[in-house]
């Protein structure tokens, strides 16, 4: 049984931009509801749980697509491509193209400043994926994800999509109220024309990750990427 809760404007936008008609429209409305709105309207549900689900569905869809599309690429390369495709700036940009921010519900203090914030839009994109998965199953979510992000996959493989892992790590720590991480050169080896550097990234004296590179900047980016891996910051 269809659950109709969307206003005509959001319903028309959904059909045109998302290319999907929800059986349970409350799922899409939840995906478009920011925490600040839910705090002011106790009966509304914020999109955080759908974001949690959508993040996993999105990662799985892209991982499976990469596995099938590039059978000869090693795990490390597949991981880098996936990271470039599902990173916050990439998802936020697709959300802008789709107009997701214009149809979100915000609290009074967040409506102006939050509507175009990368983190907000990226989270909402993931929440929409979660809503599609619950309403239409994996096929609906997969169709949407590959339609919106499929072109980015090849661009990322060719190195045309760059991920600034240092900025991502710093922003993640800042959202937790923490100071910026510190980078230290650990190893410098090899002849001048084949120099290799190993850098460690530290937070409050604790090593978060290490990375090798042909120069210090490259090594710092790899160290930050390692620090962002789930096994490095799950605690």
Swiss-Prot record:
Transmembrane residues, as ranges?
none
Q: Where is the DRBM domain?
A: 164-233
Domain RNase III, which positions? 11-137
The subcellular location is: Cytoplasm
> Which residues are involved in binding Mg(2+)?
51, 123, 126
| GO cellular component entries | cytoplasm
Key words of the record: Cytoplasm, Endonuclease, Hydrolase, Magnesium, Metal-binding, mRNA processing, Nuclease, RNA-binding, rRNA processing, rRNA-binding, tRNA processing
Q: What does this protein do?
A: Digests double-stranded RNA. Involved in the processing of primary rRNA transcript to yield the immediate precursors to the large and small rRNAs (23S and 16S). Processes some mRNAs, and tRNAs when they are encoded in the rRNA operon. Processes pre-crRNA and tracrRNA of type II CRISPR loci if present in the organism.
Q: Which PANTHER family match?
A: RIBONUCLEASE 3 (PTHR11207:SF0), RIBONUCLEASE III (PTHR11207)
Q: Write the protein's name.
A: Ribonuclease 3
Q: Which organism is it from?
A: Symbiobacterium thermophilum (strain DSM 24528 / JCM 14929 / IAM 14863 / T)
Mind giving the lineage of the organism this protein is from?
Bacteria, Bacillati, Bacillota, Clostridia, Eubacteriales
């Amino acid at each position: 049984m269809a659950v109709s809760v969307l206003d005509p404007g959001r319903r028309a936008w959904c059909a045109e931009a998302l290319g999907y008609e929800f059986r349970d429209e409350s799922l899409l409305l939840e995906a478009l509801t920011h925490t600040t709105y839910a705090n002011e309207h106790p009966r509304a549900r914020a999109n955080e749980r759908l974001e949690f689900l959508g993040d996993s569905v999105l990662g799985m869809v892209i991982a499976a697509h990469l596995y099938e599309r590039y059978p000869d690429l090693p795990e490390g390369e597949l991981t880098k491509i996936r990271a470039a495709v599902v990173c916050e700036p990439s998802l936020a940009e697709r959300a802008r193209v789709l107009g997701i921010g214009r149809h979100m519900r915000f609290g009074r203090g967040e409506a102006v400043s939050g509507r175009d914030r990368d983190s907000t839009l990226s989270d909402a994109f993931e929440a929409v994926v979660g809503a599609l998965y619950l309403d239409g199953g994996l096929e609906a979510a997969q169709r949407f994800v590959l339609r919106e992000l499929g072109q980015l996959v090849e661009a990322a493989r060719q190195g045309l999509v760059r991920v600034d892992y240092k900025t991502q790590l710093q922003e993640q720590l800042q959202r937790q109220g923490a100071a910026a991480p510190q980078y230290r050169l650990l190893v410098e080896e090899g002849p001048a024309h084949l120099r290799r550097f190993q850098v460690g990234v530290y937070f409050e004296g604790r090593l978060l990750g290490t990375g090798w590179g042909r120069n210090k900047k490259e090594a710092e980016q790899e160290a930050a990427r390692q620090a962002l891996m789930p096994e490095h910051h799950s605690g």
